[in-house]
């Protein structure tokens, strides 16, 4: 809700759409956002590129502004800066993350429907289908632009991917209550005056999650709670499995398995 509220202050965004999955466990979120009078689109759980593409087909935008749900501190002024940069250029894709100079958690991507259409039709790797814009950024077929801040704050972590992140961001919002539409510069000032608030997640790397597939993320979680990451494998997984990442399954029966 706070993310949507902050985004609603943008002067360059015409419509805000929550693009989530059609899984039943997402229904409470869908119902809640619908009550807030925002548009909701439901699509594929794993093929997020497909979800974005079909949402774009429904709403027919000239360009898409992508903000991920792990960025509750997103600043509408930064969003507007990136959107204006896209409008003033002839780029297919503009972001503020290539390379990053803003804190992790203030990520903005803007791209044309044409680029999205090409990615949808041409991207084949599961990783590219999951992370939506990697094909646009890395295929070499599109003109790419970037918005850089005058000072590099890319080492700051304001995203919410891990429990430690949640505690940091929760403390930030608590500090500013009852206001929820404070600026990123105010958060920077808080960082300088009360650094202890931000110390809990400083050991985590920027964008670590975005470079991983689902199986890799599960392996990281497993290693934190299970000695060696597994309790059932007869051999060390690092010796045999591709890229040293085992597979995890939600259930198995006989010779059949269901991948997570």
Model-derived segments and their meaning:
Residues 75-101:
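Conserved donor-nucleotide/metal-binding helix-loop-beta segment in metal-dependent transferases, i.e.
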Residues 63-67:
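Short aromatic-hydrophobic micro-motifs that form the base-stacking/packing surface
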Residues 48-54, 58, 68-85:
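Acidic donor-binding/catalytic loop of UDP-sugar-dependent glycosyltransferases
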Residues 1-62:
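Conserved N-terminal catalytic core of the sugar/cofactor nucleotidyltransferase
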Residues 97-108, 151-152:
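A recurrent flexible, glycine/aromatic-enriched loop bordering the glycosyltransferase active site
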Residues 212-260:
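N-terminal glycine-rich, Lys/His-bearing helix-loop that initiates the first secondary-structure elements
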Residues 111, 131-211:
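Conserved alpha/beta core of the MobA/IspD/sugar-nucleotide pyrophosphorylase nucleotidyltransferase superfamily
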């Amino acid at each position: 809700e706070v993310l949507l509220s902050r985004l609603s202050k943008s002067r360059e965004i015409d419509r805000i759409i929550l693009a989530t999955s059609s899984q039943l466990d997402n229904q409470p979120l869908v119902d809640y956002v619908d009550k807030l009078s925002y548009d909701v689109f439901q699509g594929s759980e794993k093929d997020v590129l497909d979800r974005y593409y079909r949402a774009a087909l429904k709403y027919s935008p000239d360009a898409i502004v992508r903000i991920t749900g792990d960025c509750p501190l997103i600043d509408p002024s930064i969003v507007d800066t990136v959107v204006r940069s896209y409008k003033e250029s002839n780029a297919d894709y503009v972001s503020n993350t290539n390379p990053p100079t803003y804190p992790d958690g203030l990520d903005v991507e803007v791209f044309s429907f044409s680029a999205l259409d090409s990615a949808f039709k041409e991207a084949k790797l599961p990783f590219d289908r999951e992370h939506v814009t990697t094909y646009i950024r890395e295929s070499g077929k599109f003109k790419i632009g970037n918005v850089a801040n005058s000072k590099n704050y890319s080492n700051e972590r304001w995203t919410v991917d891990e429990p430690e992140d949640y505690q940091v961001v929760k403390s930030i919002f608590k500090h500013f209550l009852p206001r929820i539409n404070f600026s990123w510069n105010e958060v920077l000032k808080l960082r300088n005056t009360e650094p202890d608030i931000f110390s809990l997640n400083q050991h985590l790397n920027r964008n670590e999650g975005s470079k991983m597939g689902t199986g890799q993320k599960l392996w990281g979680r497993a290693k934190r709670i299970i000695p060696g990451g597994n309790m059932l494998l007869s051999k060390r997984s690092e010796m045999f499995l591709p890229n040293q990442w085992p597979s995890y399954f939600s259930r198995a029966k006989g010779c059949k398995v269901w991948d997570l």
